Amino acid sequence: MDKIKALDAALSQIERSFGKGSIMRLGQKEQVVEIETIPTGSLSLDIALGVGGLPKGRIVEIYGPESSGKTTLALHAIAEAQKNGGVCAFIDAEHALDPIYARKLGVDLENLFISQPDTGEQALEITETLVRSGAVDVLVVDSVAALTPRAEIDGEMGDALPGLQARLMSKALRKLTASIFRSNCMVIFINQIRMKIGVMFGSPETTTGGNALKFYASVRLDIRRIGSIKDRDMIVGNQTRVKVVKNKLAPPFKQVEFDIIYGEGISKLGELIDLGVKVGTVEKSGSWFSYNSQRLGQGRENAKQFLREHPEIATEIETALRQNAGLIAIELLENAGSENTESDEVI
């Protein structure tokens, strides 16, 4: 009884000092447990993430080599958020955003806020102000590598300033994390890859900006270009692989593959066919694809064209796949196998 009284007194004191709701039992409010998500634009990746998309109120890191599809994936998330009336912002530290390409991916440019800051401090101050407003649903920072500290910009070209960017990111993330959760804003950090010199064992790859982002991120996605898509002799897109390296909301290490078509983005119809064949929703006999005894076409490209002309069948297949999401998720985890290219990079 003394313990209960002491606990009640402590809880009352905390609420008087910091306000009502500053401490509570976890099961007291159901909405505390439920997490809102925003689709990624890729059905297979939504399933692999285990919660139907990228989580709101959390930090997400997308990293990979150059031209692997990092910004494309982030722009798809913005487009999906805008479809549901969300407010989005893009911090273009690289000064490289192509508005024409963004529009082709479905981004509403009239309702997208963009900032092109001069320094890393300025970029992160703008990020903090937007997050604290509580009015932004998705905020993308492109990229961590381009967040150059003011001291580096003001200094000479040959000045050695070790750890400056890592300290900047560490301080910013300490300040941002609580605000991001309270405002239910998803912040996506796009990051680049660097090579560690003298690594004999394990992967020599690492991401820029120190280790802080690896710890604070709830989801980390490793995106790679694994091949080219050709139409006769012309390259029209990339085959892309995404691995969920870290996931605080569902089992990680699931791996998915999809096509990114130039000028179009993620090929949703191609995903429907590939996932459909995996779970048996779409039948494949030789080079012919069929669904519910109806032939979709000979060859993958013809089947995609058929679904493009018959969106109602594409919607039917998508509904069937979402109903089999659990089965697909298990298969994606098995496909990833024991292959773990991250080794010491996974937190």
From Swiss-Prot:
Gene3D superfamilies: P-loop containing nucleotide triphosphate hydrolases (3.40.50.300). SMART domains: AAA. Pfam families: RecA, RecA_C. Transmembrane segments: none annotated. ATP binds at G64, P65, E66, S67, S68, G69, K70, T71. It is found in: Cytoplasm. It comes from the Bacteria. Keywords: ATP-binding, Cytoplasm, DNA damage, DNA recombination, DNA repair, DNA-binding, Nucleotide-binding, SOS response. Its main location: cytoplasm. The keyword Lipid biosynthesis does not apply. GO terms for biological process: DNA recombination; DNA repair; SOS response. GO terms for molecular function: ATP binding; ATP hydrolysis activity; ATP-dependent DNA damage sensor activity; damaged DNA binding; single-stranded DNA binding. One of its GO terms (cellular component) is cytosol. Belongs to the RecA family. Can catalyze the hydrolysis of ATP in the presence of single-stranded DNA, the ATP-dependent uptake of single-stranded DNA by duplex DNA, and the ATP-dependent hybridization of homologous single-stranded DNAs. It interacts with LexA causing its activation and leading to its autocatalytic cleavage. This is Protein RecA. The gene is recA.
